[in-house]
Structure formats: structure tokens, C-alpha cells
């Protein structure tokens, strides 16, 4: 706080991975983020590398700490989706992903390989039959990736915010490197994973509608996108199971979307 001459400007938020505090640097509002786990630092490096293009700007960084732009707008993608405008929310997420994946002039920073990110799924699939189809699909996709680029890794309604005149921008990347199709898979399980009490992603017809929008926006092959959705939902369910919450709402949402995607693929 002293080094960057910051003043506290709100309540401290604690997550499993970070401490996040609204601050001011002179007249400038900002967010101070301090990592609680080493994995966060790849995301810090990626956010810095994006340099405000499609993502929040980074004003300063140090070991385990990041001073970043604060969202100033009143828009909320989850509320937009719940209000009957899910198609519009989906398009905003697609546009944000496209900006993040656009070529940059310099080489990317050191990031987590997507193959390593999927290890929890591969470990647990041998013990949990419900995860086996996703693990099989993930292995096939990871063995022959396409359009490899830096990935956000957690691109959903809560991580794309309204920055006023700067538009919708991403925050909180995991910092991965892999096939860009993966970054779109998270759209298909949210905002339900953030608020299971307000189902949307699992409603009849929603997966098909979102699939149509993403394919039209990106040019992806529908079958390959469905396979990445299957892989992603398996990984997400594996995380819940690994945390001892395999019977909870989060894993149930993942497995429901997984089953819908497999039916469409068949």
C-alpha cells in the first residue's frame, strides 16, 4: 500500500486464491489483488501481457501483487442473461474472448499448459465412471490441439465486467496455454455455477441456442466445440469431487451439461 501510495476505498474480499481490495491512487480508483496461491501469478502475467486489450489494465505489479483497473459501469452479464437476454450476454462473452485471443506483437509469458490443467480429471476418472467419457474426449483433444494461444481459462459472466467507456473487459484469468476453443466452453455452464438457485444454462434449448451463437461468431466446428464442452464439464466436476463436493449442485450442473452435449454429439 505504501509503495504504490494507495488508500483503502472499500471492503476486503477474500477468495480461495486472492485477497482483493478496492483502493485509490490519488484520484484514480483501482483494485489491489494479492495472491494466496502460487497458481495465481500466471494469471497476473497474462493480464499484464494483454495490456488492457480485452481485459482490465494493469497499473503496477510486484511479487504476488497486482494493481489493476477497477470496473466503473453498472452492467452485469449474469443479470443480462437472467433478464431474458442470454443471447446478448453470450455474444458479449464471445466478443471478449476474440479480443483476448487476437495476435499480439510480443511472445506470451510463462503460462500453465492446458494438458497440465486437466490432470485432476485424468486422476479421478479411474475412480468415477461419470467422468470417464470426458477424460477420454479431453485426451483426444489435447493430443491434437488447434489454434493454440494464451487462454483466460475462466471466462464466464462473473469475470467479464462493465468498464464504462472501455466496454466489457475480462478480469481474473487463470493464465493457460492451449486450444482457443477451450475458452468458450465455460460459457455453457454459467451463470449457473455462480448461482445454482437461478438455473439457466441447464434449461431445455439453452445449450443449443448458445452453441449456435458461438459457432456463428467463431466459425468453430460444432462437433469440436461440443467435445470441448464435454471435456470442460468433466474437469469442472472433477474439481468439485476433489474438494469433497461431488454430490453438490455444482457437480450436478456440470454433469447435466455434459450429458446434454454428449446427446447432441451422438
Curated annotation (Swiss-Prot):
In its UniProt record, which GO terms are filed under biological process? response to antibiotic; secondary metabolic process
Q: Does the keyword NAD apply?
A: no
Reactions it catalyzes? streptomycin + ATP = streptomycin 3''-phosphate + ADP + H(+)
Gene Ontology terms for molecular function: ATP binding; streptomycin 3''-kinase activity
Q: Which Pfam families match?
A: APH_6_hur
Q: Which residues form the active site?
A: 154 (proton acceptor)
Q: Which keywords annotate this record?
A: Antibiotic resistance, ATP-binding, Kinase, Nucleotide-binding, Transferase, Transposable element
Q: Which family does it belong to?
A: Belongs to the aminoglycoside phosphotransferase family.
| UniProt miscellaneous comment | This enzyme is encoded by the kanamycin and neomycin resistance transposon Tn5.
Function, as annotated, reads: The aminoglycoside phosphotransferases achieve inactivation of their antibiotic substrates by phosphorylation.
Q: What is this protein called?
A: Streptomycin 3''-kinase
Amino acid at each position: 500500500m505504501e509503495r504504490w501510495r494507495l488508500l483503502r476505498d472499500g471492503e476486503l474480499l477474500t477468495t480461495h486464491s486472492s485477497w482483493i481490495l478496492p483502493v485509490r491512487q490519488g484520484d484514480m480508483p483501482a483494485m489491489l489483488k494479492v495472491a494466496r496461491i502460487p497458481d495465481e501469478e500466471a494469471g497476473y502475467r497474462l493480464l499484464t501481457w494483454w495490456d488492457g486489450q480485452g481485459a482490465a489494465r494493469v497499473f503496477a505489479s510486484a511479487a504476488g501483487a497486482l494493481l489493476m483497473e477497477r470496473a466503473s459501469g453498472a452492467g452485469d452479464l449474469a443479470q443480462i442473461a437472467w433478464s431474458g437476454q442470454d443471447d446478448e450476454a453470450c455474444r458479449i462473452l464471445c466478443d471478449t474472448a476474440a479480443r483476448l485471443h487476437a495476435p499480439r506483437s510480443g511472445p506470451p509469458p510463462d503460462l500453465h499448459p492446458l494438458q497440465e490443467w486437466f490432470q485432476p480429471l485424468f486422476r479421478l476418472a479411474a475412480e468415477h465412471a461419470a467422468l470417464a467419457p470426458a477424460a477420454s474426449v479431453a485426451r483426444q483433444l489435447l493430443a491434437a490441439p488447434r489454434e493454440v494461444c494464451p487462454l483466460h481459462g475462466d471466462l464466464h459472466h462473473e469475470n467479464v465486467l462493465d468498464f464504462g467507456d472501455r466496454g466489457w473487459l475480462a478480469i481474473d484469468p487463470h493464465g493457460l496455454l492451449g486450444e482457443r476453443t477451450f475458452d468458450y466452453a465455460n460459457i455453457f455452464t454459467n451463470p449457473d455455477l455462480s448461482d445454482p438457485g437461478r438455473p439457466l444454462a441447464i434449461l431445455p434449448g439453452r445449450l443449443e441456442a448458445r452453441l449456435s451463437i458461438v459457432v456463428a461468431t467463431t466459425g468453430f466446428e460444432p462437433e469440436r466445440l461440443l467435445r470441448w464442452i464435454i471435456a470442460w464439464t468433466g474437469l469442472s466436476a472433477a474439481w468439485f469431487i476433489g474438494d469433497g463436493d461431488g454430490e453438490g449442485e455444482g457437480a450436478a450442473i456440470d454433469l447435466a451439461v455434459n450429458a446434454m452435449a454428449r446427446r447432441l454429439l451422438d
